[in-house]
């Protein structure tokens, strides 16, 4: 029986591929691994995965298990800036994707995410809308409107040396808006989208009323389907956030909630996955600190939280799971999300969850039954629900 050939175009390699290529294993998009593992078990599908690699001039190809992979060129902006700062394609990128698509000759092109130029380039080079589907992740064409919610205007315009490369917070939102223009073109160029929330359906239908919308929940990382949170084993009065690198993740709201929490629970502690964005103990650290990180640093100082906030450093899948299970409560205070995977992972493990009422969160979590949802710009409600979890232990 002839196999169906599916070509994925992703923003990053799955960990197995990254390990095979001897490049850094990404801690994002881990849910792709579960999806790939499921497809790999099917005898009637041949899976190919293409993804960008910064600065390469030749296609890199290989195989892991039954999965074939190709790395194509992702240009360096100004010679060094990483992918998230890019809004333009490159000559190599288009040539590489054209070659990969021609070689694979896929029956279906499946694009994961719409936020980068390679998504549009792939859809254009394949040029078959009815056999092209886009998996909606975030939607920068809408995200940019919420990028700086809750940050004072003077902070938005504040200058740091890192602004020379990144721009200030207003400019970063504008950059996201420009990436959104590419996204709009991509969604208009395809015949199908896969989503999972009212929010992403509303957004994609606004962009392309003719696109066919298919509902499909995401597979999460394999390890989160086993194990269960237990109150007696958690660090009492500990709070966990899974990301905080950008304003969208809402750390500024969480920090504003901490003083009220500490009034009743002086031993409360906030753990944040990822490197310490406020660290300035070297000349390089002082030069690269962003204006958002400086704002966070000021909030920590203003509320005397220096001993109450810990950045865990980058966490592997297993370490992330361990951190979830140790936590008394998980909080997602984002200014916008579609369906945050971290919230899904916390819910799978049974960790008490609190989330801002943004994007598609209401399609994931039932308020007062599976956790608590609060008004996104109300840190006092974060404090209220955190204390409620601490009181009842669930």
List each language-model region with its residue ranges.
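Conserved acidic donor-binding segment of nucleotide-sugar-dependent glycosyltransferases
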Residues: 367-368, 372-379, 388-393
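Nucleotide-activated donor-binding/catalytic signature segment of Leloir-type glycosyltransferases, i.e.
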Residues: 284-314
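Short hydrophobic beta-strand element within catalytic cores of glycosyltransferases
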Residues: 352-355
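N-terminal subdomain of nucleotide-sugar transferases
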Residues: 1-58
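Conserved donor-binding/catalytic core segment of Leloir-type glycosyltransferases
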Residues: 7, 230-249, 255-260, 270-273
């Amino acid at each position: 029986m002839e196999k169906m050939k599916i070509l994925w175009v992703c923003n990053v390699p799955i960990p197995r591929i990254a390990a095979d290529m001897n490049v850094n294993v990404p801690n994002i998009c881990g849910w792709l691994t579960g999806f790939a593992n499921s497809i790999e078990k099917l005898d009637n599908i041949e899976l190919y995965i293409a993804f960008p690699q910064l600065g390469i001039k030749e296609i890199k190809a290989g195989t892991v298990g039954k999965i074939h992979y190709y790395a194509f060129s992702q240009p360096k902006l100004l010679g060094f800036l990483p992918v998230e700062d890019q809004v333009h394609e490159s000559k190599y990128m288009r040539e590489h994707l054209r070659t990969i698509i021609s070689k694979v000759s896929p029956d279906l092109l499946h694009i994961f995410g719409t936020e980068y130029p390679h998504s549009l380039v792939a859809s254009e080079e394949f040029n078959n809308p009815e056999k092209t589907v886009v998996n909606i992740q975030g939607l920068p064409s809408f995200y940019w409107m919420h990028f700086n919610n809750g940050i004072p205007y003077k902070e938005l315009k504040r200058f740091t040396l890192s602004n020379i490369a990144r721009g200030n917070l207003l400019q970063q939102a504008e950059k996201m808006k420009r990436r959104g223009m590419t996204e709009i073109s991509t969604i208009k160029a395809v015949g199908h989208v896969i989503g999972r929330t009212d929010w992403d359906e509303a957004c994609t239908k606004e962009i392309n009323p003719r696109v066919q919308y298919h509902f499909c929940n995401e597979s999460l990382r394999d390890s989160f389907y086993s194990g269960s949170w237990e109150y007696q084993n958690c660090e009492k009065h500990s709070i966990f956030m899974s990301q905080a690198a950008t304003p969208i993740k809402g750390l500024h709201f969480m920090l504003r909630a901490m003083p009220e929490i500490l009034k009743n629970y002086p031993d409360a502690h906030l753990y944040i996955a990822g490197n310490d964005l406020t660290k300035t103990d070297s000349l390089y650290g002082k030069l690269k600190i962003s204006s958002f990180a400086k704002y966070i640093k000021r909030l920590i100082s203003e509320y005397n939280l220096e001993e109450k906030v810990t950045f865990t450093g980058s966490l592997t899948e297993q370490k992330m799971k361990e951190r979830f299970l140790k936590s008394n409560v998980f909080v997602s205070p984002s200014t916008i999300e579609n369906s945050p995977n971290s919230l899904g992972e916390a819910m799978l493990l049974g960790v008490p969850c609190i989330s801002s009422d943004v994007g598609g969160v209401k399609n994931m979590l039932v308020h007062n039954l599976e956790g608590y949802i609060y008004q996104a710009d109300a840190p006092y409600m974060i404090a209220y629900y955190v204390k409620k979890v601490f009181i009842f232990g669930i």
